[in-house]
C-alpha cells in the first residue's frame, strides 16, 4: 500500500517504513509524530483511489528522526567580463528526516 502525499509544496510517494527528506518543518521536534492529511492518491492492493483534489479520510503518519539536516552546499557564481566584477554566493538547504510509520486510507 502506498500513497502520494503533498508535504510543504512537494509530492512524495509514501510507503510504510520508508525514509523521506523533506524541506524543513517548523516546530517539529525529534521523535515527535507528524500527520499529513493532503493525500492525493492511495493504492491499496491494486485498488487505486484518486482524490479530487484530496482523498477523504486518508492520512500519512510519520515520525521525525532529525529536524535539522543540511543538504549539500550549492554555489552560485556571478561574473561580468572585463569589469572585474565577481560575486560568489553559497546556500545550504535545511531538511527534515522522516520515517513513515503508516498510511491510513
Curated annotation (Swiss-Prot):
One of its GO terms (biological process) is translation. This protein binds to 23S rRNA in the presence of protein L20. Keywords: Ribonucleoprotein, Ribosomal protein, RNA-binding, rRNA-binding. Belongs to the bacterial ribosomal protein bL21 family. PANTHER family: 50S RIBOSOMAL PROTEIN L21, LARGE RIBOSOMAL SUBUNIT PROTEIN BL21M. The lineage of its organism: Bacteria, Pseudomonadati, Bacteroidota, Bacteroidia, Bacteroidales. It comes from the Bacteria. GO terms for molecular function: rRNA binding; structural constituent of ribosome. One of its GO terms (cellular component) is ribonucleoprotein complex. Disulfide bonds: none annotated. The keyword Ribonucleoprotein applies. This is Large ribosomal subunit protein bL21. InterPro entries: bL21-like (IPR028909), bL21-like_sf (IPR036164), Ribosomal_bL21 (IPR001787). Part of the 50S ribosomal subunit. Contacts protein L20. HAMAP family: Ribosomal_bL21. Signal peptide: none annotated.
